Amino acid sequence: MPELQFLGGVTLRDDRVPYDVAVVGAGPAGLAAAATAAAHGLSTVLLDEQAAPGGQIYRGIAASPLRDAGILDGDYWRGGSLVHAFRVSGATYVPEAAVWGVARREDGLYDVMLSRGTPGARQSRLVAARALIVAAGAHERPFAIPGWTLPGVLSVGAAQLLLKSSGQVPAGRAVLAGCGPLLWLLAAQYLKAGVAVDALLDTTPRGRYAEAASHALGFLTSDYFAKGLRLLREVRARVKVVEHVTALAAEGERALERVRYEANGVAATLDTDLLLLHQGIVPGVNLTSAMGCDHRWNEMQASFEPVRDAWGGTTLPNVFVAGDAGGIVGAEASEVQGHLAALAVANGLGRIDARTRDAEAAEPRRALARALRGRAFFDSLYRPPDAFRRPVGDTIVCRCEEITAAQVADAARRGCSGPNQMKAFLRCGMGPCQGRFCGLTVTELIARERGVSPAAVGYFRLRFPVTPLALGELAALPSTEEAEQAVVRTTGTH
């Protein structure tokens, strides 16, 4: 069998010998999908941008640097069994592999383009697969406030990754601001790690609990209730919590020096060395968008997500999305969705019939219903307020190109009707992040100026490569037979 040797000793099949399924992402959804697919006799390759399996939620699970396991909650440590199940499944694992493109061949196979290696010596190669499961996870929602580009301002997610992967915690004064479960979770983890959290500035709007009350029954009967109550009590007992914060700004000359905020109509400042911001996470849609999958606006979660069926199937044949990449559902539900997507692939490729697929999916579907119980309550309670999703004035929106909210709003008033036109007006979304930091904010600002829903505005039209790629690396990519034939057909017409 032809094989291709990568840097670091990882051996992959030649693109002429396809895998049955390629899984992108090694979080709970990807790990479960790969293990289930391999268990059904499918040749499976798991492509992971990180150095070790676990994704963001289980980052560092295979070799945690933390001496005190109690700093991270029990939900984190259960990821170890998921990683073990994957490792013994027989699936091929490719770490540090950034998937930057996917192309469908005329014969229905998918060419997955990935980059791997050390900085300055990366190589791009093709992996062919009959089916694709995208489990690329989520990223934090943009939280553009005045001064958020100052040194000393980070996201809560970035701070938690430092804690999980290297055991690093801040040494000076720290303030957390925003809304959502992760904000409170990090505060509790910091307290256990001995970090002094000076304040937690809660941006959850007044009256939001009343709005979420219609979903309270599901929440009260879920596992989230007891965990959430315990978390809130731990933090409130030891941290100054300021509720109903309606304005935030980071201030300082060359680095963060203080946080200015307004709550209940009263303005105040806090001197601090570190400000950690968070207002929820959103699906990572860059890959599925560039592939051409249909997407829709989720009003409750205020984000775009791929259109999927009950198995995670998208509008492209044999392409599935599992986990938070398809809509925020949490780690447990993501794992179950990975199982379901793999069962659908096994059925689609003829390894199991529909009756077997449905029988094996019965218990996972019950588990999925349990895992999603209470999710609607969180989505309603912690939906970020408009004021923090739609900044104004000189607040930087696009960090890559240093474009302000006022510039985006002005372009919209001058006739720019959507994010793709905005690229021509201001280059928003054309930097290295490809819209991850600004995409939703740009959409929301245009929607505000036009007086329409973000669904009517849409999102950036993304193209490959979806991650930064050196031109030399692209030029060295081995050509496929289809690409060579395309050149022959083109040159033959002249």
Task: Identify the residue ranges that each predicted region occupies.
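Residues forming the flavin
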Residues: 2-432, 436-494
